[in-house]
A protein has these predicted regions:
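Short aromatic/hydrophobic "clamp" motif used to bind/position activated sugar donors
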Residues: 83
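Conserved donor NDP-sugar-binding/catalytic core segment of glycosyltransferases
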Residues: 95-124
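Short beta-strand/loop segment that forms part of the nucleotide-sugar
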Residues: 30-39, 60-63
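A conserved acidic beta->alpha catalytic loop
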Residues: 37-46, 90
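Short, flexible, basic/aromatic active-site loop/helix in glycosyltransferases
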Residues: 113-149
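Short, well-formed alpha-helical segments that are part of the catalytic scaffolds
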Residues: 11-25
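Acidic donor-binding loop at a coil-to-helix junction in glycosyltransferase catalytic cores
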Residues: 170-176
Length: 249
């Protein structure tokens, strides 16, 4: 199995180094790591370049904004037969890739997501994150599986479902897993030790949690595809301009 890791970034200078450093410590080294810069205005690219001699690293720039565009751009240049899409604020433990490879081979999973633990001093944030992981694992056994933050797919599955939908404003990750399920691929939630930063919760406080709940409710009451801005999100997709997104709150 040749594993390509794709990391979409927009202004992630404060966290991307931690992820790349963690990837240098993997017992099973990634075959390829692609950082996709999505119009950053900080030093994300420069900080990523510091790892060019430590990792099989490639840095590219997405031609359009949005997380879906960035992930698809990374997949377009990736050479692996297994693609892993990681948010920049994740910190996997040293056995992350080794555990992933074993579980995928054992269960013949073709697409899905990973369990995560929220790194936070606040118990309410940790409990909220645990709830979301539990919800994801529950939904994996329904016709409507979901995934977020860290996802994977075989190259064949990715190409069959046409990757991530750039027309979606949010929850393109949910849609990605759902499309794979509907295409007949076996979905699996990989149990790993991977920490996720609580920075969005620290920056937005309870608003971040409310946004997640609102997005989920909106998704089920207005259809599973959210194509218009329902709140401000810098990595959102869809047909609106970045100015329109920034003015949405």
């Amino acid at each position: 199995m040749k594993i390509s890791i794709i990391i979409p970034c927009k202004n992630e200078a404060g966290v991307v180094e931690h992820l790349l450093e963690a990837l240098t410590r993997q017992s099973r080294v990634a075959d390829e790591i692609i950082v996709v810069d999505s119009h950053s205005t900080d030093t994300t690219v420069e900080r990523s370049q510091q790892y060019a001699n430590k990792l099989p690293l490639t840095i590219i720039k997405a031609d359009k904004p949005g997380a879906a565009h960035a992930r698809n751009a990374g997949a377009a240049v990736a050479t692996g037969d297994m693609l892993i899409f990681m948010d920049a604020d994740l910190i996997p433990d040293a056995e992350f890739l080794a555990d992933f490879e074993v579980q995928v081979a054992k269960h013949l999973f073709a697409a899905g997501s990973f369990t995560q633990q929220m790194k936070s001093k606040k118990i309410t944030i940790r409990l909220g994150a645990s709830f979301m992981v539990g919800y994801m694992r529950l939904m994996a056994h329904t016709p409507w599986p979901i995934g977020f933050s860290c996802l994977y797919a075989t190259r064949q599955a990715f190409q069959t479902i046409n990757g991530f939908d750039p027309e979606l404003f949010i929850m393109e990750d949910y849609d990605f897993v759902l499309k794979a399920k509907r295409a007949g691929y076996k979905i699996g939630i990989i149990k790993t030790n991977c920490q996720s930063s609580d920075r969005r919760y620290r920056e937005q406080d309870f608003k971040q949690g409310l946004r997640g709940i609102y997005g989920e409710l909106y998704r089920y009451t207005h259809g599973l595809r959210i194509t218009k801005p329902i709140y401000r999100y810098d990595m959102g997709g869809g047909t609106t301009t970045s100015t329109e997104k920034d003015s949405t709150s």
